[in-house]
Amino acid sequence: MPMNKDRLYVGLYACGGGDRMPGGEDSDNGNVEGVRYDAKERMTKSSKTKWYFEERRGGVDGNGMLLIRLIVAKVPQPSELIHILRQVPVKQGLPGWNCVAWVKEALEKIEAHGKVLGTHRAEWLDVMDTALWYVEKKKPEHRFDGQGDYDINNVPTYDLMESKETMA
């Protein structure tokens, strides 16, 4: 793949606390340059949580917490993609809603637009299933527990469009 083409990645990050998603989507590393779009949760002064949208340019590794990433699309129209991502709402007080639900909705809105992505494989079930499979594949290789001999600056990357690993 030419390196000068914009790509859409979906990253799976380690998060604190126990698993919260019924399908295990949030169960259980390098500095990647780009822009991170995400729904994040933070505590308020009243000890409640509030969701907010984050758009952050620069390193998107989440302070070393990026477990894996998937290449899901070529992006010939980055400005239109950015516009769509900025419009995906964060939802307060909805039981079970979290950052995984935000990514699902974002991918669905991008797919519905129909003209933002070039070559792609961004259907939610494919993305979710592949992300969970890829993390499970990396666990016995000791990619996340510190026992393996890996450069933490190289995030395991799987190209969903070509069905192959591009960085172990």
Kindly give the residue locations of the regions a language model identified.
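N-terminal accessory segments that precede or flank the first globular/catalytic domain
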Residues: 1-41
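Compositionally biased, low-complexity repeat tracts
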Residues: 7, 12-14, 20, 30, ...
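Residue-level marker of intrinsically disordered, low-complexity segments enriched
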Residues: 8, 30, 70, 114, ...
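Low-complexity, intrinsically disordered/propeptide-like segments
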Residues: 11, 15, 28, 56, ...
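Intrinsically disordered, low-complexity, compositionally biased regions/tails
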Residues: 15, 28, 38, 68, ...
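Cysteine protease-like catalytic core of ubiquitin/ubiquitin-like
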Residues: 29-74
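Active-site nucleophile-His-acid catalytic modules used for acyl/amide transfer and hydrolysis
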Residues: 57-145
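C-terminal helix/juxtamembrane-tail motif
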Residues: 141-168
